[in-house]
Amino acid sequence: MDSEAVYAMAPGADQVMVVGTGCDEDQALLDAASAVLTGDGHRPLASIASNSWQIPLGDVSPQTVHAIDVRAAAEGIGMYVASGDTPGLTVTDSDPYAVAVGGTTLGIGAAKNRVFETGWSDDFGSLAGGKWTDLGVSGGGGGVSDVYRQPSYQKGVVPASMAQVRVANKTVLGRTVPDIAADADPDTGMLIGYTDTDSHGNPGPYRTVSSAGTSLATPLVAGLVADAQQGQKSPYGFINPRLYRLARTGAFHDALPTSTSAPQQDRAAYIAPDDTSTSEDVDVLDAQGRPDTQQVTAKGYDTMTGIGTPNGAAFIAALRRAH
């Protein structure tokens, strides 16, 4: 999915897939990230790294991740990190030297126009035998870090009310996540093509499946930045300060709550019949206000979509002018 998403945005991009090995999954991911920076010993493997993985808070120390991200910034490498597919923060997206990518639900009309776009936060439920079962929320991660204070690039853009966090019995302003967003809702995701094999290793028919999550949003954003970087004299590297300077401009589309961003007929639910049972799954878009998520989609910066979604060619042109 990552590779196809990057190629969809930047067909001419040179891609390098880097994987980690070993029984410790978290360490393997960190090793892969470090390998991108080390490269061949003379230069890094890439100037843009799309990281469609997360490490939960508490699994590794923030200092370990921070050291990698600071080194990347010093070497001119942009670290694009998925904000995760459940509410809250991870140790990887909350680092102030990472470009944290959140998710949206994107409605496209018959004329290929944007009908609506809101923060990805879907409320799942299932109806079977006359009984309604709440299946929880699926959506992009976000929130306020109690480890890192608000970086200078977020000042004046992130509302103080969204950045407040209690640390050592004091209210301070913390690093707020995400920074930017792109389509991540499985209901509005991207078709990924693949060819499966049977039990004997013979190739089967070519298939497509809708795939998404912030693991889709991250390479979509990374691919757009690669488009903007193409032909420039030097790589963009860590671009958060540049992104926040472009907030509230035509470079970004401001994702809004469905109550204001979507036509009435598109607000309620996505209903998908299950062919294998008698149940129906109902997915209510923009499930704000649930007790298990404190995130919101709002005008301007918000904790679901950051400063917004890249506005195509306008985003590319603005990023080049700001370089």
Question: Can you say where each PLM-predicted feature lies in the sequence?
Answer:
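Feature representing long, continuous alpha-helical segments
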Residues: 178, 218-223
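Glycine-rich (often Gly-Gly/Gly-Pro-rich) flexible segments and glycine-rich loop motifs
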Residues: 97, 102-171, 176, 254-276, ...
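Short glycine/serine- and small hydrophobic-enriched flexible loop segments
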Residues: 222-230
